[in-house]
Amino acid sequence: MKNLFLLLIFCWSGILSGQITDAETQLKNATKTDTVKSWKKGALFNLGFSQVTLTNWAAGGNNSISGNGVANFHLTYKGKKCAWENNLVLGYGILKQNQESIQKTDDNIELTSTYGRKATENWFYSGLINFKSQFTDGFNYPNDSIQISTFLAPGYLLGAAGMNYKFKEFLTLFVSPITSKTTFVLDEKLSNSGAFGVTPDKIIRNEVGGYLRGNFKKEIMKNVKMTSSLGLFSNYIKNPENIDINWDLLILTKVNKFITVTINTNLIYDDDITITSDKNGDGINEVNGPRPQFKEIIGFGFSYKL
């Protein structure tokens, strides 16, 4: 009887052990599946070309060829109490007319990372980092001997802490009362001249202020998607009423699986960047001071989404 009792205990322990092992395995698999589902990644590539060839054209004109490419990568994590969004945008465009040297029409590097902990249903305690720069040298065309910008000249690094409001899946509003904005000018000639608001002979300019950023991303009609990002920064120390503005807008119209039409605009106003212009056409730049900067690119090309 004693041996039978011990045998029953041994069998029952084995059954319980098997059940616990199965439960642990199911829990691990469920946790692993939930973790994988929490991460989302993707990319969008857009490439456009245009060409103009004229032969004995009585009305006149220039032969030209141009190309423009944009790559947009995103990686997001969404948990029960936290969210982490990362976005990298790379853009570059060139233009060649007749015998003139190649000129760039677009040059952009932008990385944005936002992490948030849930406070209420729609509000998150959040931190944001944004970095901007360019790939290659920029020149004061048509004079390609005067360099006016290059990689990390300028470069912008913005760090902010605040609250992020999320409305459904297409609209977010980030508000930060504590923001640090750093401007880098790592090219010696440009920094010595005080370009992009740095003190002459200095390579870094630091600012402290308030920051507001709104993001909108939605299919506004069938096969038409709109993405917009608006950033506003106010320097608490110097001229806080002069708001720095950076507004990006992208409208993407899908013709078929691979063909798209895009409209891309960028509006910038930075109170620390001096713009010179020839007001009376005598070849001398008379006007100096901050000015609105605007860029527009309309393209027809190939698009691929991962």
Regions found by a protein language model. Give the residues of each.
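Residues on the lipid-exposed face of transmembrane beta-strands in outer-membrane beta-barrel proteins
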Residues: 43, 47-49, 69-77, 111-117, ...
